[in-house]
Structure formats: C-alpha cells, structure tokens
Amino acid sequence: MPRQPFRPVTPRLRRRFTLLTFAALSLATSAGWAAEPERVACVPPGVWADGTGAAVEPVPLLRRVADAPVILLGEQHDRADHHRWQLHTLAGLHALNPELAVGMEMLPRRLQPVLDRWVAGEMTEGEFLKATDWRTVWGFDPQFYLPILQFARLHRLPVVALNVERSLIGRTARNGWAAIPEAEREGVGNPAAPTEAYRNRLTETLAAHDRSEARSTAPADSPDSAAKRFIEAQGVWDRAMAEKIAETRRTTGRSVVGILGEGHVARRDGVPHQLADLGIVDSAILLPWDADRDCDDLDGRIADAVFGLGLAREDAEPQRPKLGVQLEPGPEGITVGTVSSGSVAAVAGLRTGDRILVAAGTPVRAPADLVAVIRRQAPGTWLPLTIRRDGAEQELVAKFPVEGR
C-alpha cells in the first residue's frame, strides 16, 4: 500500500508552538538560568517533521508508521539522547501495534540464544552483559541500550540479533566477498548492488580516513580496488542485517523495529535498499535530529520523519578515554578492524590490519584486555602500544586528550 504523504502542522499550531517556546524561554530566564545563544533549529525540540523539515502531526504519523512491516530507528551509537528517543518511540509504536519485534545491530546472530533467555526473564542485567561479552562485542555503554532491552522483556517482545561477526566484514574489506568460502559467510546471501548515491557516500567516507581500511592492509592495491572492497563489505553488512529483519518479519508476522546506526538506514540506502531487494519495499525510516545539525541534510530523502532534539545536557561524569577503533578477535590475538577518522588511534598511526600485542606493558590477547587498559588511562596521558605490521613489530604512542578538549 503506498505511503500516505505526511500532513503538515497547521499555521495555528505553529503559532501555538512559537508562543509556548517563548513562554518556556521566559520562565528559564526568570528562574535565573543562563541565557542560551540564539539558535534556529531546523526541527524544533519535541517536534516531528518530514524529510524536508516540514512539521507533521505526531499521532497520525505514528499510526501510519506502526503498521509498516519494518520500522528503522537510526542512532549515533554514543549519544544517550538518541537512545532515549528510540525507547520513547518504541513505546509509542507498541501502544499502537503490540505485535512488534525488536532487531538490534549491536549483537551478532550467534548470541540469539542469550537474547531469548533475556526476554524470557532468565537472566539479570549483569548476567546478560557477561554472556554477551558486551564490552568486547559492541563496546558502547550498555546503559544506553538496557532500557530498550528491559522494555522488550517487560512486554515479551522478541529481540533479534541482526549482526554478523565483525571479522566477516573485515575479511570482506581486505579480500573481497568472492574470497570468502560459502561455509564461512554465516548464511549471508549476495547483496544487491548499491545505489550510485550510496556508493559515492561510502567512497567519500573512505577517502576521509587518513589511512583507509583496505589500502592499509593491501598497500599494492589501487585506490579503486580498495574502495570497491570497502563498498562491498558495507553491502554485505547491510545485507546481513536486512536478511535477518526480513526473516523475522516472515516467520513471526510482526512489525520489526530495527535499532541501527544512522549510516545503515539514511536516505533509504544500506539496509532499506537491501530490504527492498528482499521484497520489503515499504519500510519506514525515523531519525533523531540534533539541534546543531546542518539543515541542508533535510533533503527529502534523509528519512520518512525526524524528531527534533534539544541541545544535549548530560550529567557531568568522567569522560572515558576512547581509542577510536573496532577490534577483530582471532586465534593469534586482536587485529584492528576500522580506525575512526580523527581519533586517538588515527593520530597515533594505527591502521586497519595492525595486530596489537602489548598496551602499557600488558600483553593483549583479547579485545577485553585492551579495553581494560584503556579504561585505566587518565585524560592527558600517553599509552604506549606494541603492534605487528607487515611481519615486523613497531612501537606507537596513543595520546589521549586532556579532559574537556
């Protein structure tokens, strides 16, 4: 059934919103709070808008979306307010359609039995985090995701592990999908060819890295070969999650709410594109919209709807140091999978394919070993690393910034 156009908010409601906003600001000032610098948000906080930024009424929007076969809720993994929005949106959808399942990018499919035990109420939070090896497998703060998992358990909603092992994606980026034996593909089929826009976006992402993934592990490659494999690996990743979503929809008949990174869902590329190839052409894409985000991103294709967030204010707590890498465990230790552009790891010179042997004098055999060392690092300190690259050992120094910088 074709998706209905979103109905804009009436001028009367716009005026009411403006008056309420002015009143709220007046109260804030009278209460003695510091005045904020004037900011014009593309999407005001607390307002739903379509992909062009035009406000839409929330109840009709959620009613339409709740009946979609797949609803994809994007996120930036390290943003607490994004995860609160996901939880509240999930609750709203559940009120309109209790026949939901929740799909999570955060865990590989081998951990599905653990998720089943969680939903059945057989595990405490601590037992769940230990059984999933959360800090190693995903790494982002579990407190961001536990409220969503608790909601699913409370309502006995199936929770589905959408991902595959990161090593599969890393191998594809290094060697190409054709080089992966079928028995080692974790059941993932061949991805549909990406759209030209997605291909261009991924190429730009690869170029933004000081040292791109594929080129750092295969220095003789041409940039075109490196980019081709990088795009292919992303397609395999998207396909794996799309196949699991489609399977859940087919076997349960439930609407599947996907909790995924925005890069996998925006502009109907990535996972939505693979879902369409699998026969699910009418997935819905919802995104949180940060107050300081560029308004030019509201191009009409970014999402079916976005929700305006205010400037994030979190309780002050010590900033945990981040190296900025994804790690791939293996029989010989841990290998650097991806390196975030501009991260501590990138500045230190870490590359995809490097094997980390020692951190601060501590032998590193598993991702948890390195995580434990990093969590002990104070802001402004240096972390010596011993790595193996191209068969030779090297010494690098990761310099963590002073807190607040």
Residue ranges, per PLM feature:
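PDZ-domain C-terminal substructure recognizer with occasional recognition of PDZ-binding tails
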Residues: 152, 351, 357, 372-405
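Bacterial N-terminal signal peptides
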Residues: 16-30
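N- or domain-start disorder-to-order transition segments that initiate the globular core
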Residues: 32-68
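Zymogen propeptides
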Residues: 53-54, 58-94
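A substrate-binding/cap region within the structured catalytic cores of diverse enzymes
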Residues: 113-246
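Bacterial N-terminal signal peptides that target proteins for export
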Residues: 4-20
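PDZ/PDZ-like peptide-tail recognition elements
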Residues: 298-341, 346, 376, 395-405
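Conserved PDZ fold ligand-binding element
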Residues: 345-367
